[in-house]
């Protein structure tokens, strides 16, 4: 008979940013243990609050199924001697399995015949194995820094206070992490019953809510917070900024969410909204509120962990807590503006970017030069790009950014506007860090794009140049920086060559770099970002590899090629031409001599080779405009027309003729044919 199963681990406050991950891993690990043990069930559900991890298993079977274990013995020709008597090997095997040789069955396969013992193994009772399974599931949680507590040797992410393991109404005896299983559950720290007993797994989690004032279901708490915040914002005439990461964190901080609203003085709205929001979200875990035009309102939403008879006191307390932080932001903003950004440039000499690569002032000088170089190639204003590069890191020396680090860039923009800098320059100071994460917006075209690429390329080339390429960890976020550069080049269609950009960036370091292979390593590293990016976009890996085989170092050009090959692959002729290219490649690989593209028409004998030679010559001329403009889709569509003469050639012509001149001429024809395709991609790599 199947029953509900419950395990709850009561702890001290768990790290909020890890709570969901821990709970999901616990459930996944336990489900894997059940699968390994072959114990049937109808699903594992996890629960998590700041002070507990729990899971329930629906309709968990009371035991493993009985099973037959086949134990193969020695081969028959080894098990018996010439007289047909059992050998010592056979007798020893039989004795070890509690049978006689005569009781053994035979296993016959196409490889021979063996002795066989089929043992009937009774399934274990679920109650006898679940404690060990739960202990394993908990031991394999992703905990970076486990801790010890008291005088115990056990380790966990936080001290464990209670353990409850119920199978239906049966309390499963056992100990995990030094705590014995009991029926005691702990309620909310400040509301409900502090402790109470649970009689059966079916009562969970309802009993926690009814008696303990704890909503154990994570998704329920999260939904309450979102819905309550949206309603509260509407009542304020605004829209709540419910960033999912913050909602998750708040959900992980409360056991009984109560959504409340508060306000702050309107005078603080003179401070850039980003600084106020940084304080509200980062420090206090509040949700900012905006009006319909996305202007910050002097209100915020917060989530209390208790129901109070005097909610006004809680509101006033939160307002009192946030006020000094907002006042600090106001003070920093007013103080910083008394000094132009450019005046802070010398201060960058005192800030180290990287010991071998120099100060942030050194980096600023390189960014300035590289941004101007890039701007010239993409048609952006060179002087504005250089100015933005010069000012790019100056806000790091302001009080605001020193105190509120996440406001770097955006505060530079506000201060630049105050100083009267050109709008493009000011905006670039903020957008230099874009895209900040996967899926983030790109910097604006022109000046912002030039500065953003210059900053990222300087970091990538510099770190590779001193031999610190990322392996497991990536402390300088070089993968993200590389993808950022690639996205800007691809999505804006900038036909810039990475080889040129990297060489220019390298030259600006003077003799600081020690890695002689820095340019090639950076090229390979950046091109290595393409497969995952384009696979995520829906392109198959063989299409990507077909293009990468040509080592295209212009990202925008790579993009055009991938899309063209994807279009080509859908054509009726694609499969046959891909196979033909593979065949051609294999044939050419066996030839040791040098091949050009000059076909000797006088040596063409067969009608099929004459037809192919003529078709290739005509095609080569017809494709010149498409290749010149990078219209690879048009080029491949035209190349698809070669299928018929290619098929006829292989059906009727012996390439590896006995006559050396004839053979070389035919190989030259195939080489010219293959090179037409290779100007775009190696389509021989396309799979069926």
Swiss-Prot record:
Main subcellular location: cytoplasm
Gene Ontology, cellular component aspect: cytosol
Compartment(s) where it occurs, according to its Swiss-Prot or TrEMBL record: Cytoplasm
Molecular-function GO terms, alphabetical: arginine-tRNA ligase activity; ATP binding; glycine-tRNA ligase activity
Family annotation (InterPro entries): DALR_anticod-bd, Gly-tRNA-synth_bsu, Gly-tRNA-synth_heterodimer
Keywords: Aminoacyl-tRNA synthetase, ATP-binding, Cytoplasm, Ligase, Nucleotide-binding, Protein biosynthesis
Example of a GO biological process term: glycyl-tRNA aminoacylation
Keyword Repressor: no
UniProt EC number: 6.1.1.14
Catalyzed reactions: tRNA(Gly) + glycine + ATP = glycyl-tRNA(Gly) + AMP + diphosphate
Quaternary structure, from the entry: Tetramer of two alpha and two beta subunits.
NCBIfam families in alphabetical order: glyS
Family: Belongs to the class-II aminoacyl-tRNA synthetase family.
Annotated PANTHER family: GLYCINE--TRNA LIGASE, CHLOROPLASTIC_MITOCHONDRIAL 2, GLYCYL-TRNA SYNTHETASE
Name by which UniProt lists this protein: Glycine--tRNA ligase beta subunit
Gene behind the chain: glyS
């Amino acid at each position: 008979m199947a029953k509900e199963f419950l395990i709850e681990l009561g702890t001290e406050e768990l790290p909020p940013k890890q709570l969901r991950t821990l709970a999901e891993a616990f459930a996944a690990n336990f489900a894997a243990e059940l699968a390994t043990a072959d114990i049937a069930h109808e699903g594992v559900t996890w629960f998590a609050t700041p002070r507990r991890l729990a899971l329930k298993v629906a309709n968990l079977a009371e035991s493993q199924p009985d099973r037959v274990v086949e134990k193969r013995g020695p081969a028959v020709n080894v098990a018996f001697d010439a007289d047909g008597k059992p050998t010592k090997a056979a007798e020893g095997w039989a004795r070890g399995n509690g049978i006689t040789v005569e009781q053994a069955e035979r296993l016959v396969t196409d490889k021979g015949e063996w002795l066989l013992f089929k043992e009937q193994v009774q399934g274990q009772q679920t109650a006898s194995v679940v404690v060990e399974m739960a202990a394993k599931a908990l031991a394999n949680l992703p905990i970076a820094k486990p801790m010890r507590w008291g005088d115990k040797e056990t380790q966990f992410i936080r001290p464990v206070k209670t353990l409850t393991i119920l199978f239906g109404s049966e309390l499963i005896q056992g100990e995990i992490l030094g705590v014995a299983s009991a029926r005691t559950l702990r309620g909310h720290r400040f509301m409900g019953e502090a402790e109470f007993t649970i009689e059966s797994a079916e009562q969970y989690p309802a009993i926690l809510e009814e008696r303990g004032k704890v909503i154990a279901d994570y998704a329920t708490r999260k939904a309450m917070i979102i819905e309550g915040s949206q309603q509260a914002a509407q009542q304020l005439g605004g829209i709540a900024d419910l960033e999912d990461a913050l909602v998750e964190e708040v959900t992980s901080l409360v056991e009984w969410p109560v959504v409340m609203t508060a306000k702050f003085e309107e005078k603080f709205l003179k401070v850039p909204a980003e600084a106020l929001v940084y304080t509200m979200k980062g420090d206090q875990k509040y949700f900012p509120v905006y009006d319909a035009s996305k202007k910050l309102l002097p209100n915020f939403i917060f989530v209390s962990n208790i129901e109070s008879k005097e909610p006004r006191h809680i509101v006033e307390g939160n307002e009192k807590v946030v006020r000094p932080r907002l006042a600090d932001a106001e003070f920093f903003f007013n103080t910083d503006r008394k000094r132009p950004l450019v005046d802070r440039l010398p201060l960058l000499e005192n800030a180290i970017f990287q010991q071998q690569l120099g100060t942030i002032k050194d980096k600023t000088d390189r960014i300035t030069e590289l941004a101007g170089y890039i701007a010239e190639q993409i048609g952006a204003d060179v002087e504005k790009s250089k100015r933005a590069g010069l000012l790019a890191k100056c806000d790091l020396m302001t009080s605001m950014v020193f105190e509120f680090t996440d406001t770097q860039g955006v505060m530079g923009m506000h201060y630049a506007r105050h100083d009267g800098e050109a709008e493009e320059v000011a905006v670039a100071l903020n957008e230099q860090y874009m895209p900040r994460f996967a899926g983030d917006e790109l910097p604006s075209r022109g000046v912002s794009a030039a500065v953003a690429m210059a900053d990222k390329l300087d970091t990538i080339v510099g770190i590779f140049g001193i031999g610190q390429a990322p392996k497991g960890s990536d402390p300088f976020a070089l993968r993200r920086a590389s993808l950022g550069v690639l996205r800007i080049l691809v999505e804006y269609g900038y036909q810039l060559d990475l080889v040129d950009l990297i060489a220019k960036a390298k030259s600006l370091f003077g003799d600081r770099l020690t890695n002689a292979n820095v340019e090639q390593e950076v090229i390979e590293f950046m091109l290595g970002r393409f497969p995952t990016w384009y696979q995520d976009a829906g392109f198959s890996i063989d299409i990507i590899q077909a293009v990468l085989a040509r080592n295209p170092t212009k990202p925008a050009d790579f993009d055009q090629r991938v899309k063209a090959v994807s279009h080509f692959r859908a054509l009726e002729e694609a499969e046959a031409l891909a196979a033909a290219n593979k065949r051609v490649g294999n044939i050419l690989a066996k030839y040791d001599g040098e091949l050009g593209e000059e076909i000797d028409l006088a040596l063409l004998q067969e009608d099929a080779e004459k037809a192919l030679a003529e078709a290739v010559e005509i095609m080569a001329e017809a494709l010149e405009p498409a290749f010149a403009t990078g219209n690879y889709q048009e080029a491949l569509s035209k190349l698809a027309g070669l299928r018929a003469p290619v098929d006829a050639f292989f059906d009727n012509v012996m390439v590896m003729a006995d006559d050396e001149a004839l053979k070389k001429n035919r190989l030259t024809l195939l080489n010219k044919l293959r090179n037409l395709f290779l100007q775009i991609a190696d389509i021989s790599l396309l799979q069926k």
